[in-house]
Amino acid sequence: MNIEVDFCHNMECFGAFEKNPKLAIAVSGGSDSLALMLLVKHWNEKVKGEITILTIDHHLRSESTSEADYVSSICQNIKLQHVTLHWIHKGITGNIQAQARKARYQLLTNYCQEHDILHLITGHHADDIVENFFIRLLRGAGLAGLSSHNLFFVNNVRIIRPLFNITKQDLKKYLEQQNIKWINDPSNSSNKYLRTQVRDLLKSMLISFQHNFTVELLKKRIMLSQMHLTQALESVNNEIIHYVVHVVKIYSAGFAVIDRKLFKKASPEARYAILSYLLMIVGANTKPPRFSSLQRISLHDIQEYNTYKTLHGCIVEYSIEYIIIYREFGRCYPISQVVSNSVVWDYRFKVVDNRKNNHMNLTIDYLKKSDYHLIKSYVESNQRNAYFNYSKKILFTFPVIKHLEKVVAIPHIKYYSDKTIQESVSFVFEPKLISRWFHYC
């Protein structure tokens, strides 16, 4: 195989790029990302884009800084711009890999946004896809979870995974041909991580198979199955679009409403997918909830009303007519922030501050129950407000503007004690997940 030709063909799958596109490539120093960097550089000879190499120093291992410097030195030799981004933390406990992945995407996409870069290219290769398939299978994933996605958005940045049919072995061979050495991350071979356990499981599975059934053949068969699943998902997507248009409303105040009667007519897969997207949008998440958790809240299992469940940073409330999904802060309430154009509150609401003179020190916060008595009469006199037709509890998830700890504005219900605020400060709902299927009321 000619890996450079195959890679250029893969890049065509993502559609046409704009003239002289700005591209970022996530490169750790491992074989996958270094090979990706060289392949993109070759492809870019025709595209004439502007490439920036981004390396994350996680500060979890003593070698991490020298590894970032190694990537920088390679970039200098091949004349590519390189930037090291640092994950600043006070020590990590719990699921280190999950937290590192979340921080990594946050740092990468933040940089892309700040430098007007739309495309972020990452080294997710065929072996990763196969391992993810088994990991999700072990967790009981549904159709959407088992299918593979090589193009998606995080924080309005286009994530591209062009190595989807290229194996790790082929990437290493390519680096050897280019006389480039790579770094081996010891965590990739540690049995305390599920991915390593799955990798070993795949190898052990072959022992009981016929002698001519190789690891590579197994990977190809699994990828073929994933392709069929992805095709099946496309047919479900048409159903999803239909029900999103006719059954779902997402309000710019950050909550969603589903027509319960019509939603019952959707297939289970469509219901699970729609609920998953809504929970990510409302709950400020970039990753979907577990399939088993979705089953708990599906209409297939819950027929009663005047009840609620909590999941994925959301409260899912059931009335006779509707399913209402709104934010649950739990134990982690959003912090109070000074109003300015750089603020994104609760990872969902972007502040628009058009004040020419910021002499009034305003803060953005959530509505506390102790604040409610100050606006109770206004709320009760505005019962016709569409938001109050569903659940008054939603009010306590809206962003409010305070001055000296007093609520002076709740823009989403048009409450203002100061007209100058009404004319100058507002919020725009910008959730982490952006989907072509949803629009906001």
UniProtKB/Swiss-Prot annotation:
InterPro entries: Rossmann-like_a/b/a_fold, TilS/TtcA_N, tRNA_Ile_lys_synt, tRNA_Ile_lys_synt_N. It is an enzyme of class 6 (ligase). ATP binds at S28, G29, G30, S31, D32, S33. One of its GO terms (molecular function) is tRNA(Ile)-lysidine synthase activity. Its main location: cytoplasm. SUPFAM superfamilies: Adenine nucleotide alpha hydrolases-like. It is found in: Cytoplasm. Signal peptide: none annotated. It comes from the Bacteria. The N-terminal region contains the highly conserved SGGXDS motif, predicted to be a P-loop motif involved in ATP binding. HAMAP family: tRNA_Ile_lys_synt. Ligates lysine onto the cytidine present at position 34 of the AUA codon-specific tRNA(Ile) that contains the anticodon CAU, in an ATP-dependent manner. Cytidine is converted to lysidine, thus changing the amino acid specificity of the tRNA from methionine to isoleucine. This is tRNA(Ile)-lysidine synthase. The gene is tilS.
